[in-house]
């Protein structure tokens, strides 16, 4: 059967074209689509299982995103020449697409859904992650699955106050090398035609108004892409009425319930047994662990009750109904009494305490505790040898700052099998890293590790606060302290009411409809990530949340500064000191010496580590050492080697040898020249007034290109009368 290509085109303001295609590739999938922009091409497929999975409490959705090395014209490095496990950038894109699509599936979907996105071709002028949401939405929209889409994403950056949609890696890189290019925003926005679903990115202390301006700008392009998807769907002659791949929860109950009892009876029965007790527990302002234990005991009692009454209902069904009742009770307390589970009002921040220098053996450390969430961050300083090298299908780069986030199971009082770094840990670590990367200097390679020791919500934001304090404790001169806060949205679906919560608890996140993580300094935002469970939020809700977060951020910063008001004046005594300076490229060989002997001698004698590299026609010298005195000696030695005299400048020179035709003098340790007899004085005798070891003044006249020697003069410093009088 000959493939039938169906295609839709649209154009950006700058004239670039974007196309959406279906019908030609991957026809065995329930839905497939290709998006092309420039030479960047992405293929997305969606496959739905024929049988439902009845043991899930959530939508069994799996997103897989892979960037093939062939897309960028590369072969994988290493011994195995094929793509392996996904790298961090791929995992971050998987999480991004998941957050975009998951809210738009029905809650009672129990058929497995697998969406696979592949980068087939890569163009340096178009980054693929901004198109991943578009191609995935198109594939799902033309499949049989019931989906409240279409949706789309765009990447938007701002350089010199000008917005660019779906930029390339070169545009972002240029801002790092050219001072006149100021990239202060890099954002991915996702949404439906009327609402925003996804906001994620980093900023350089921009205002809340500028943030909303970028979101509104991006949403206009999202709407264009949604129109293109709708047009593509209507062109698809084979597009059939969507089938609802799901298992109706209530119908499922009927199969297991005797005596013609229905699910409403069961729900009312569970309410009768537990409602007042649960309500009392949630109003008692208990600690999370104690509250969870009491709730768990109630659940066990309910299961035991149904078992004794011989009502055939499985534990999963009880769990789902019990969760619904818990959510209903918590929402009632919030909306009717404006009191939260820990007794706070809607705007209150939990109690904060912090400490620094808690681990004396590391370069910098801090513990940040907010309520029942606690993070321990450590800072390790290194050199350019310790950079995090990124070499994947589309990018080759070096990170001088990187942050690793660990979320061990004991932080929530659980036992779990440790299987390496989870996707969640990678995502939270990346968010904290983006929050801090633009406020630290680039002299050092900096590795921050954050271990969550206790968690009851907002652990990634606690990581940002702890890491800021740890950086300040290490002596790194941060531009300004950064704090983080999680903002929540709770909707009442019956009345349409909505409330915004500051500093989310874990249970509030679980029952809520939005978790909006925002980080920033007193001057503006540095990073954000929005995760919602509903089909979108309006500009008004988004704007109100962002402006409300500012108040919380400033409060947290004020609390942090009571622990450490400014960065330490010097690096920790255990930290390696680094000194970086530039030399002319042609003098690199002089520093290294014959066979590397000179640089090795300096390193051994001063107990330092010296790294030399070329950059922009200069030699970059990086000297590392723990002893400040020896480090200064190494610096002095290299500066002596690379000493370049200035024409017309007078220097003190030491006489090394005397000849009839002049004297050999040294104006630095490694720079020697001949002071000819005719340049010594207006007299003809030398020995009568100059001896070996004398220190005399000489004027540097430049180089003798013929003999490749330096030219020096003594007599040009003074007048003839002065010399005759003083040198006789």
Curated annotation (Swiss-Prot):
Mg(2+) binds at residues 509, 515. Its main location: cytoplasm. SUPFAM superfamilies: Eukaryotic type KH-domain (KH-domain type I), Nucleic acid-binding proteins, Ribonuclease PH domain 2-like, Ribosomal protein S5 domain 2-like. GO terms for biological process: mRNA catabolic process; RNA processing. Its cofactor is Mg(2+). It is found in: Cytoplasm. SMART domains: KH (SM00322), S1 (SM00316). Gene3D superfamilies: GHMP Kinase, N-terminal domain, K Homology domain, type 1, Nucleic acid-binding proteins. One of its GO terms (molecular function) is RNA binding. It comes from the Bacteria. The keyword RNA-binding applies. Pfam families: KH_1 (PF00013), PNPase (PF03726), RNase_PH (PF01138), RNase_PH_C (PF03725), S1 (PF00575). Residues 576-638 form the KH domain. Residues 648-715 form the S1 motif domain. InterPro entries: ExoRNase_PH_dom1 (IPR001247), ExoRNase_PH_dom2 (IPR015847), ExoRNase_PH_dom2_sf (IPR036345), KH_dom (IPR004087), KH_dom_type_1 (IPR004088), KH_dom_type_1_sf (IPR036612), NA-bd_OB-fold (IPR012340), PNPase (IPR012162). It catalyses: RNA(n+1) + phosphate = RNA(n) + a ribonucleoside 5'-diphosphate. It is an enzyme of class 2 (transferase). Its EC number is 2.7.7.8. One of its GO terms (cellular component) is cytosol. The keyword Nucleus does not apply. Keywords: Cytoplasm, Magnesium, Metal-binding, Nucleotidyltransferase, RNA-binding, Transferase. Involved in mRNA degradation. Catalyzes the phosphorolysis of single-stranded polyribonucleotides processively in the 3'- to 5'-direction. NCBIfam families: polynuc_phos, PRK11824.1. Belongs to the polyribonucleotide nucleotidyltransferase family. This is Polyribonucleotide nucleotidyltransferase. The lineage of its organism: Bacteria, Pseudomonadati, Bacteroidota, Flavobacteriia, Flavobacteriales. The gene is pnp.
